[in-house]
A protein has these predicted regions:
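Conserved AAA+ ATPase "SRH/arginine-finger" region at the nucleotide-binding site
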Residues: 58-62, 131, 136, 148-161
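Conserved NTP-binding/hydrolysis module of P-loop NTPases
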Residues: 2, 54-58, 65-84
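C-terminal alpha-helical "lid" subdomain
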Residues: 1-16, 29, 39-53, 142, ...
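Pre-Walker A (Motif I) flank of P-loop NTPase domains
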Residues: 26-32
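Short glycine-/polar-rich loops that comprise or flank the Walker A/P-loop
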Residues: 53-55, 121-123, 144-149
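A short acidic, amphipathic alpha-helical/loop segment
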Residues: 45, 109-116
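Sensor-1/coupling segment of RecA-like P-loop NTPase cores
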Residues: 33-36, 117-141
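Conserved P-loop NTPase "ATPase switch" module shared by AAA+ and STAND
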Residues: 86-110, 124-129
Length: 219
């Protein structure tokens, strides 16, 4: 399988969200929310973007507290408390990507800490959550009103699926095979696993392409 980061429409929209946050005027909050069902590539995209934009990527957990947050962020900033974190980010703004934000829904103090960091520094902060994250965050009106960019990751269309297969697979999939996959699978993880399975089958059987008929026999 080719090691390529495929820029699906979701990825392009995520890039657009980050760019919009970076370029917003100072008087507009630079807080964004990306949400969607599992398996669509949100976490992989967030990590890729954090590297691309020299940002900070953190994965939340149900044990995460405001204090833990202020200990974790400084690992990237060589700072040791809130005031120094703020000072460092003012000197050299970095986007902060908080994945699995759902774990923080019942920990408003931690969410407030992130809001305060954005208020003080203007550094973009992007929350990444599951399908109902936007509904859950609506409970925190003071925070939700600060979301200037909100993006939902959608299931893949046929064009995205074709792009994923064509760029990742080392064996050709016929159009009817791609349509067959589209009718049954819409999660990135599922698609990648399927491509890997079909590549191995093609290699073991000296095949140069995968057809719908072959897939129906195997799956």
């Amino acid at each position: 399988m080719n090691k390529i980061f495929v820029k699906t429409q979701n990825v392009k929209n995520f890039i657009g969200l980050v760019e919009n946050l970076i370029n917003k005027p100072q008087n507009i909050p630079k807080i964004g929310l990306v949400y969607g069902e599992p398996g669509l590539g949100k976490s992989q995209t967030a990590l890729w973007l954090a590297c691309k934009y020299d940002g900070i990527y953190l994965r939340a957990s149900n044990l995460m507290t405001g204090r833990w947050l202020l200990e974790e962020i400084p690992r990237f900033l060589t700072s040791d408390n809130f005031n120094i974190v703020v000072k460092k980010l003012k000197q050299s703004p970095q986007g902060i990507f908080i994945d699995e934000i759902d774990y923080l829904m019942n920990n408003y103090k931690t969410i407030e800490t992130l809001r305060d960091i954005n208020d003080e520094t203007g550094s973009p902060i992007i929350f990444i959550g599951m399908g109902l994250a936007h509904r859950k965050l609506e409970r925190y009106k003071h925070l939700y009103d600060r979301f200037s960019e909100i993006l939902k990751f959608e299931t893949f269309g046929i064009n995205d699926l074709s792009r994923i297969i064509n760029q990742l697979s080392e064996v050709r999939f016929t159009p009817d095979a791609t349509e067959y996959i589209f009718s049954k699978y819409n999660r990135f993880r599922q698609i990648v696993q399927l491509i890997n399975q079909m590549e191995n089958f093609a290699k073991d059987n000296n095949l140069t392409e995968i057809t719908k008929e072959i897939m129906e026999q195997i799956l």
